[in-house]
């Protein structure tokens, strides 16, 4: 068997064994995708024992390409919500996530200096303790750039493997300890969250308003500023028994009923000016109008503003809501259309058909992957990651690397959505498949490279000490941030658990947090809020630590 065929066969064996190990669960907790690392260690141990030689260049390429695939698909997935998560609504949660990363870095620095742990080992332990595989890849690359010997860089995988199991279990232990220490009642926390979130959430609502203001009589809809703002959409007008879609030139009369869509505070502003809220149905049932949901798939309209389509004037159709990546937005005239946007339409059946053809509404396109944008994004990411940043006093130029470069590019492209006919939308199933493939390839190679000396290090070397260091890097930041969040800002416990899981970019911990109260969405919401920024910081932090430790 050729070296290439043997290498591919061994990687397949590692993946099968590792995924099988990852599916093992003890009290509902398993290693998940991390099992691939241990599958690689087992196979790597026997490969060295029986002197099986694999193609080193091929292993190196597969490891790096797997990492690129993983971080790029992560960036495309979280890109649309990354920048919005930094706004005021998630500012507090993201501040705690930043604090956790900083405390983890400080603990790592103290252990490195206090116990004289070699730099490659402590960075590997750090990556495993926070269960973040891209951090390991980023740390390996920056150490290689700094000139660290390859045999030392390869030891990082062992440090990662030693710390990883407690990284998975430690966060669950901390959640339990916080619950015990503060004597938390889960049902009470869930009710408190539902009450608070129900009052503050920025979901779109509807309101039927009767025109009572005599100053509006005889004015057209376009002459009333509040009815043309980006915060409220007037989707229907009822006059007597006639229900219509209001055009910009439609004249308002006293006694008209308007159906408005927007956030509650914006609707209240319109009500104060227009008249009073009334309990009158403006349903399209039994009328010439109907409602429909269509998907934007036509490349010709991507990036265009809703006003540019002139749907009201041409087709007497109004867009009442815009759903983007599961988030409902006001369909303001200035909103740009992106691939995969779901539009709620109101109009006559034949007009809705015409509008559907304009925006695309081709469901099958949502299941197709445009490969050209994928490789453009990957190429740009690698180029960005290769750009050297020279800092006076540093022994080597800083780079975003193969982990940071593709991530930053993917975040930006995911936020932009499309450029001309190129769109970076990726079906969730395709994104997940590429992401899982990438991480399996990366972990398989890391495990194979680490397996030869793993058992000896654990039994006869410093393996147990590394496990202890990892436990400190896992536990101290989690306990510090968890206690501060609960004591200082009285953070809801379910929200706190989701924030801790998101800060560790740990899906098994999210599953555990969701299981605390299955009907509450508190944990999932806070996890999604902090995950994008936390993932970015987790990838960048070992590179910063590596450069700082190297120079000190």
From Swiss-Prot:
This is Putative transport protein YpsIP31758_4141. GO terms for biological process: potassium ion transport. InterPro entries: AAE_transporter, RCK_C, RCK_C_sf, Transpt_YidE_put, YidE_YbjL. Belongs to the AAE transporter (TC 2.A.81) family. YidE subfamily. It comes from the Bacteria. Its main location: membrane. The chain crosses the membrane at residues 1-21, 26-46, 65-85, 96-116, 119-139, 158-178, 371-391, 393-413, 439-459, 464-484, 493-513, 530-550. Residues 192-276, 279-361 form the RCK C-terminal domain. Keywords: Cell membrane, Membrane, Repeat, Transmembrane, Transmembrane helix, Transport. One of its GO terms (molecular function) is monoatomic cation transmembrane transporter activity. It is a multi-pass membrane protein. GO terms for cellular component: plasma membrane. It is found in: Cell membrane.
């Amino acid at each position: 068997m050729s070296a290439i065929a043997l290498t591919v066969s061994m990687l397949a064996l590692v993946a099968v064994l590792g995924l099988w190990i990852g599916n093992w669960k003890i009290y509902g907790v398993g290693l998940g995708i991390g099992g691939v690392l241990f599958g690689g260690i087992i196979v790597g141990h026997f490969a060295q024992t029986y002197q099986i030689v694999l193609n080193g260049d091929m292993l190196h390429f597969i490891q790096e390409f797997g990492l690129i695939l993983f971080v790029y698909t992560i960036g495309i997935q979280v890109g649309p919500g990354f920048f919005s998560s930094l706004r005021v609504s998630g500012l507090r949660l993201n501040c705690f996530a930043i604090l956790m990363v900083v405390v983890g870095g400080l603990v790592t620095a103290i252990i490195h200096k206090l116990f004289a742990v070699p730099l490659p080992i402590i960075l590997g332990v750090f990556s495993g303790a926070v269960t973040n595989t891209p951090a390991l890849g980023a740390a390996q690359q920056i150490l290689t750039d700094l000139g660290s010997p390859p045999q030392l860089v390869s030891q990082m995988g062992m440090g990662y493997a030693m710390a990883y199991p407690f990284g998975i279990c430690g966060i669950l232990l901390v959640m339990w300890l916080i619950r015990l220490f503060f004597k938390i009642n889960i049902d009470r926390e869930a009710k408190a969250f539902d009450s608070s979130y129900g009052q503050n959430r920025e979901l779109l609502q509807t309101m039927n308003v009767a025109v009572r203001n005599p100053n509006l009589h005889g004015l057209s809809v376009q002459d009333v500023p509040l009815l043309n703002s980006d915060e409220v959409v007037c989707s229907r007008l009822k006059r007597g028994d006639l229900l219509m879609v209001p055009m910009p030139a439609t004249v308002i009369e006293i006694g008209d009923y308007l159906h408005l869509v927007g956030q509650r505070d914006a609707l209240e502003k319109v009500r104060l000016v227009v008249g009073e809220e009334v309990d009158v149905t403006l349903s399209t049932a039994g009328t010439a109008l109907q409602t429909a949901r269509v998907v934007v798939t036509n490349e010709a309209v991507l990036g265009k503003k809703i006003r540019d389509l002139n749907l009201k004037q041409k087709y007497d159709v109004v867009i009442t809501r815009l759903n983007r990546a599961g988030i409902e937005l006001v369909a303001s005239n200035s909103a740009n259309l992106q691939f995969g946007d779901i539009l709620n339409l109101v109009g006559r059946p034949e007009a809705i058909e015409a509008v559907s053809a304009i925006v695309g509404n081709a469901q099958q396109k949502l299941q197709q992957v445009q490969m050209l944008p994928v490789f453009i994004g990957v190429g740009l990411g690698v180029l960005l990651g290769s750009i050297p940043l020279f800092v006076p006093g540093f022994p080597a130029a800083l780079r975003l690397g193969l982990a940071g470069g593709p991530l930053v590019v993917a975040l930006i492209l995911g936020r932009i959505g499309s450029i001309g006919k190129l769109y970076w939308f990726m079906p969730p199933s395709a994104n997940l498949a590429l992401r899982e493939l990438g991480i399996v390839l990366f972990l398989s190679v890391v495990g194979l490279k680490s397996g030869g000396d793993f058992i000896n290090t654990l039994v006869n070397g410093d393996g147990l000490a590394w496990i202890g260091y990892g436990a400190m890097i896992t536990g101290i930041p989690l306990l510090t941030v968890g206690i501060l969040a609960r004591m200082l800002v009285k953070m809801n416990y379910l929200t706190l658990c989701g924030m801790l899981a998101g800060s560790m970019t740990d899906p098994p911990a999210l599953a555990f947090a969701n299981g605390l109260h299955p009907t509450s969405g508190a944990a999932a919401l806070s996890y999604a809020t902090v995950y994008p920024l936390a993932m970015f910081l987790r990838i960048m932090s070992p590179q910063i630590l590596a450069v700082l430790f190297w120079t000190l």
